[in-house]
Amino acid sequence: MGIGTGHTSMNKGGKDVTLLELSVEKRRWRINMETSKIILEKMQSDDVLDGNRERSNEREGRDSLSEKLKSKQNLKDEEKLRYIKTGKSIQVEGTVRAKALRWVQ
């Protein structure tokens, strides 16, 4: 899969929302670059994680992502994170670097 460097915007209620799809713990998540909030939508994974497939229940996805961010990277409340575009990857408050898979609508 190629790494995209452009971005797209989605119009939601008259506001343009820029989304970035990125890989975290071998799963894809969408990031709202304008409000620095994670759009808690689990994407279909290209990887099978050692035969352990998490259910794609939205609540479980939210808890799983939140726990992974806080436990693996020792981050603060994800709603307060600032996402900084750095070339072909993004950096989350200087702590985490995740490859941007593509910009999504």
Swiss-Prot record:
This is Putative uncharacterized protein encoded by LINC00523. It comes from the Eukaryota. Residues 46-73 are annotated as: Disordered. It comes from Homo sapiens. The gene is LINC00523.
